[in-house]
Amino acid sequence: MSNVVVCALYKFVSLPHFESLREPLLSMMEQAEIKGTLLLASEGINGTVAGNQAAIDALLIWLNQQNGLENITYKLSFDDEMPFYRTKVKLKKEIVTMGVEGIDPLKVVGTYVKPKDWNALISDPEVVLVDTRNDYEVQIGTFKNAINPVTETFREFPEYVKQNLDPAKHKKVAMFCTGGIRCEKSTAYLKEQGFEEVYHLEGGILKYLEEVNKAESLWEGECFVFDNRVAVDHDLKKGQYDQCNACRMPITEAEKLTPDYVQGVSCPHCIDKISEEQRKRFVERERQVNLAKSRNEAHIGSDVNHVIEARRQKKEALRKQSAEKNKAKQANA
């Protein structure tokens, strides 16, 4: 039996004084030796943490005692090793960042579909099935016949909808994500845009894998998760993928054998995207990691989100440039 319990949780709820929750929540997690990150915002709480069973039970009890955080949505999985290095509670503007003002899942949201009913819904030929996750997540697994919007961040999803979905044409839209939280916002957004029949998988992919028999499953591949496991299989056990420590993309054993892969420095996905300055920094970080290992010490490593953010900014700049060119063409027409 795996002795590390991984708990993914979220709840959309009005928390006008969410800042005051940070210190007591962080203190509780540290005392219970829980690692991972929880996000707090005026719209609720979201995150994934891990610890022993008693610690996770204590956290859920603590949250249930806080005003507004009763009956929080959570999913448990298990691992042999702690998948997180740090304990964090962050204050945010949104608990899942879409970047669109006024989207409130507490006011309007799509129709929840339980895992046992999901296969029937997505087998309907009139249903447009959309994976709301990022492209690197979709690449290693998704539902049969699902559309991949090819987004790098959730911020790009509204633009995908504007360019590709039409409420007059697409009468039934079903969406899914890892644990359900992104679909809370994506379905709320579609409802705001005039789509009438909008559905989403209750509990997300993780709940589906937990409850639906593999023989009946329409899931193909593995499910990306945002911790050191990288991905889980249909049994919610650690999958076959590793992760590039430079760009955080999931990588296969075959990709690790290519010349582009250098442990902790680059992989085929990011070899052409990292700067020389970044490469040098990653080389030094890897040297420090190996030095710590030789001393039998823990090394947390540095934050590599700047690589992902740089990629997002570059794509956004290209999108704006394209939009400006289209405006110029229309003006000259």
Swiss-Prot record:
GO terms for biological process: tRNA modification. Keywords: Oxidoreductase, tRNA processing. It comes from the Bacteria. It catalyses: uridine(34) in tRNA + AH2 + O2 = 5-hydroxyuridine(34) in tRNA + A + H2O. GO terms for molecular function: oxidoreductase activity, acting on paired donors, with incorporation or reduction of molecular oxygen. The keyword tRNA processing applies. PROSITE patterns: RHODANESE_3 (PS50206). Its EC number is 1.14.-.-. This is tRNA uridine(34) hydroxylase. The gene is trhO.
